[in-house]
Amino acid sequence: MNQYHIYEAIGHGKCSTVYKGRKKKTIEYFACKSVDKSRKNKVLQEVRILHSLNHPNVLKFYAWYETSAHMWLVLEYCVGGDLRTLLQQDCKLPEESIYGLAYDLVIALQYLHSKGIIYCDLKPSNILLDENGHIKLCDFGLSRKLDDISKSPSTGKRGTPYYMAPELYEDGGIHSFASDLWALGCVLYECYTGRPPFVAREFTQLVKSIHSDPTPPLPGNASRSFVNLIESLLIKDPAQRIQWADLCGHAFWKSKINLVQLPTQPAFDDMIGINTKPCLSERNGDRPNKTPPKYREKDRKGGSKQNENSIQGSKGHETPIKGTPGGSKAQAKLPSRATEEKHGGRPAANRQVNILRLSRIAKANLQKENEKENYRRPLPNSNENCAEVKIDNTDMELDFDENNDDEGPDESEGTENTSCAQEERVMSHNENHRRQRVVSSNVPDENSSANETPTLGEARDCHEDQSEPMDMSAAPPSASPQLKTHRGRETSGVAVNHDSSKAPTSLTDVFWHISDLSVRPVMPSRKSDKEAVHSLSFETPQPSDFSKKGKQELEPLNNRIITVLSGSSSGLSEKQNLIRYLETLSTNADAANILTNGPIMLVLVKVLRLSKTPAFRVQIASLIGLLIRHSTSIEDDLANSGILDSLTNGLRDKHEKVRRFSMAALGELLFYISTQNEHKDFKPPESPSKETRSASGWQVSNALISLVSSVLRKGEDDLTQVYALRTIENICSQGAYWATRFSSQDLISNLCYIYKATGKQESMRQTAGSCLVRLARFNPPCIQTVVEKLSLKEIASSFVKGSAREQQVCLNLLNMAMIGSHTFTSFGRHLVTLTEEKNLFPSLLSIIEQGTEVLRGKALLFVAFLCKNSRRWLTNFFCNARFLPVVDRLAKEKDSYLQQCLEAFVNVIASIIPGMLDTITNDIQQLMTGRRHGPVSPLNSRAPVKTNAHLFPVVLHLLGSSSFKNKMVTPQVLRQLANLTKLVEASFQGRDDFRVTLLQVLECITGDAPLVTQNGEIIIREILPSLAAIYNGNKDGDARFLCLKIWFDSLTILLTECTEIEQQISEDLKSISNSHFLPLYPALIQDEDPIPAYAQKLLVMLVEFDYIKISNLLRHNTVSQCFEFLLGDLSSANVNNVKLCLALASAPEMESKLLSQLKVVRRIGNLLEFVNAKDMEDFLEPTLSLCRAFLLRSLGNKKGLSSNYTKEPTLLSEASFTFEVDPQECIRDIADFGSNIGLFLHFAGLDDDTSIAVADIASECVVLLLKAASREATTGFLTNLPKITPILDSWRRRKSTELHLLVLKRVLHCLGYACKQYLSQAMILSISGHDVSKINAIVSEMKNSDAAGLNSIASLVAMELQRLPR
């Protein structure tokens, strides 16, 4: 998988996560599916099927890989997501949109069927969409080949109930073409209506609805062909359901679907044949049906009469049926078969559905998953109907395999398995997961008896045994053992409920996850021997019947059992058969309670003590263990039976198998005793040897504890040690009392030896590690002993190489060592050994990126502990380019435990920074005084680090992370950085590199608006002045640019984004702008690009917001510099140049004489032409405003302008421009604008709403120019009469606004004034008579205008036009 870059998670399953990935050095994207290795068989099955498929509507499979903890599938990446998400967003789709989906689905299904593959899991979440909206079928984990179905039709009863066909709930029902087509009908129905056709929150109600209720009609105006298609797909009888030939030729399809050759379905044909035989037997209490039914009878209300716990195709039609008036035959008045099936009614053939049995099987399989983590842990809602399954969502998948008892190795015992349970919560059908798969791969089960030699694989079989051959249609006994709610055990340090609303305060608040205390049965499951039951000489009720019998009813049976067990007349064979029968009873919780708390258990204890036959003692010990395992309550009376002594003696037996099963049974009993939690407020005894008396009848001596612990000594049988390890693991999960009793030096040494032993199976080593974790958790001083026996380097090495479960154990041990570091005499000696494990960092990064939620969270905590204990680790993690992006992506995860770990991690790392900055500051001060030199020791060196300045880049990297930035930047940190900016003004070894990093850090901070606004006072008073000092005399261009950019970013945010600036901050801002920035401006403007552009923009902003006065600017002789850009290449000009010149030209403090001396009017006109030619819209208004400012200055002194000038045109009035003009204040080269009057008129003609402001300024410039340079302006104006016509004509085209009218009035005034000047100065110009006539016509119309003032001006202009020579 190191060929791929792994990005964010795009989908989640129960034991899988799908990531977006990219192949390295390419732009090819893939979906990389990571599956827990415990699902290896299922993954390989999916790979085999995907490898054989190649179709545009089937998800492409590229490769698969196996890593130490996961299986990886590299699949096609579909950007459109899945259909389920689409329906959640849009609720439902129109028929025309469904058509394309349906067409692709039919093509894809037909392709699969042509390859002999039944999909078995068609539902919206398995239908992906590509960028073009075409569908892709995915997830073939449940798919089956026709050949496999023919060989074993009864297996594979798994699926999503909402989309399963009715026949799949029936005895003998199998997957087929027909069941896939039913699912297709459900999907299309859901696309149109927004919900599946049959909906219920409880499994039993859902199955009844699917099997009995007619298909709900489609709402709205669905086409007849679409309605017919849905009805044909949702016919309940698979034999009558639409088939491929009819489906391909259906009227719904606009383009033809070609029918391909399909393989035969022998198993399906057999199922149909069986269901149509003339006589069937019904298994409902083993009562035969004499006649084959055709239809179900309706009662008087029209409802069908049926057993609550089973649904049948019909009742016998030749036998009078209860509830039928007069007992008449049922079929006479019923509708025809075709009529019912047309409406998706009931199946015609005789089929039986035992709903309660199916529900109980599904519930049992769900509980088995739960028990892997929650054995003997009370579960919520325990008083609800134990056979009912709540269906949380339409995508929930259930397992209906009754033989799923020992479906594979225990999650801790498989040589290749890893604990899928570690990434799950307490079986609450986690709604954050898209898939809720509760199935796992099956392995063949073999019957075994206790006197056969068990293999280590048998010891792994620790799931609940639910294979009893009972009729589940009877009243429901407990489907699997569930404890009564015991008094809550000690929960010190247990993070069970990860409430994301409560923020963690420290790492220890989120240290533990519920999976850290997962417990499992010690006793392996035993397969019931059905033959043994039949060979007994007395009646043997089924477990469900046994549990219903009263005490008096059971007494004769108990006496017979006791007689056989204790009587000398009974042969060994009969006793062994009886034991096998009792094993069958033990799998029922109610029956196990009766046997455990009754006389039979007392006899079993006695027989175990007295029997001399090893094989029989093995069976007795096994039976005792099974009874205790499955019992939910054990009375204290059993404590007086000597059961502990008997099992203890068995543990001392010389026969290996007796010791094995005695240990397993003793382990179950000790664990039960530990759950009675009477040591809630336990405090360790003064002496470890001091006995602690229990309030209950159970007394567990220290000698017994020592005996169990001694089993782990070197040389003992591996299986016996497995049972002892499970015992210790389970008991130590119950709190400090029990953990302290087991915390002996010898036990810890033995556990460490087993954990390190290379010859032991991985699962055994993991259990030993789990025991060490629990001992150290509830008895913290133990961790020091563990680390002395098991070095941190060895634990880290196991973490690198181990499976997911071992990695969780290693992380817990490492984290506890970090927490207890203060108890070690020299923890640094231990910690430095971790640096020798070169693969530690890559493994941690891989876990944080791709591991389960629990492992990710714990890995983050470990990184935090490492960095907290030694700052050397900071650079390893946070200066790595991959680490922080991975951490940032975790913020998108929904898992509450992971989010709390992430928050605690961020808080801890952020809390390290202030102390680190203080240390760096002290080191630099010592470097400056010569008391310390700069070289840095490497990470793996044992020598003390000479300086910490090399850690400073960590701050920069953290600021680039969205997770850390806001947590890190506090007033304290900012003041520390401000202090460092003062220090770097002086010289010291390594200063230049450190200074650039410091400036980059400040740049990151000042680029964030909230941080700047919250800390404006510190930035303005303490940081910005120091930056001005750093700029001065700095030879590094990058450093100089960063200084200015920090100024620019900070002030831009403060000036533009702060609604109100405090008065004191405003005064400070004004002060530093004039005292620090303005003196630098001449140097800034001469610096290398892009520094001048930033400096100009900042200066303009400060001038506009009145923080810098023009008078202050003038003192620094910067005027000529500001206008220099006009003399150079105009293409290099920026808008801030123009704005700055505009500010200067508009300021009253500016002397016109200075502007006149610059002689830049012609260059300003050239700039206007350049702006127009290049269509530079952002330059247009400032450039025109600059022209206007120069024109205004040319007309008189500054005071006169402000008091007498008005925007209303007065050129034709008697009193126009009556104020005095000071020749010294005029712009001498103002007449150069005369060549630009055509441009002014062009811009004045822009009359759309977005350009009216430009037209306003341009028309004003024309008015001012005619007065300032009358002759030149008149010449330009009259030679551009064609440009005047459209301006005046706009009066006709649009409704005039106030500003538009002002522009028209100005142009009319200019026209009249120019005519006057032409005549008065006897100018010789060639004027087009045609243009004059057109203008005259428009002006004549304006004389009749009702717009205010326009008609009077038009009259005056008309008179002047008449005077022009023709």
Swiss-Prot record:
| Residue span of region Disordered | 276-356, 367-386, 398-502, 524-549
Name the domain of life.
Eukaryota
**Induction info:** Cell-cycle-regulated.
Question: For this protein, what is the EC number?
Answer: 2.7.11.1
PROSITE patterns named in the record: PROTEIN_KINASE_DOM, PROTEIN_KINASE_ST
Q: Which SMART domains match?
A: S_TKc
Q: Main EC class of this protein?
A: transferase
SUPFAM superfamilies from the UniProt entry: ARM repeat, Protein kinase-like (PK-like)
Q: Supply one GO molecular-function term.
A: ATP binding
Q: Write out the GO biological process terms.
A: cellularization; cytokinesis by cell plate formation; endosperm cellularization; microsporogenesis; phragmoplast assembly; pollen development; radial microtubular system formation
Q: Which proteins does it associate with, and in what oligomeric form?
A: Binds to microtubules (MT).
As for family, the record states: Belongs to the protein kinase superfamily. Ser/Thr protein kinase family.
> What's the stated role of this polypeptide?
Essential protein that regulates phragmoplast microtubule organization during cell plate expansion in cytokinesis during cell division, both somatic and syncytial. Required for endosperm cellularisation. In pollen development, involved in cellularisation during microsporogenesis by regulating radial microtubules (MT) organization in microspore mother cells. Seems to not have kinase activity.
- Name of the protein in question: Serine/threonine-protein kinase RUNKEL
Q: Specify the species.
A: Arabidopsis thaliana
Q: What is the lineage of its organism?
A: Eukaryota, Viridiplantae, Streptophyta, Embryophyta, Tracheophyta
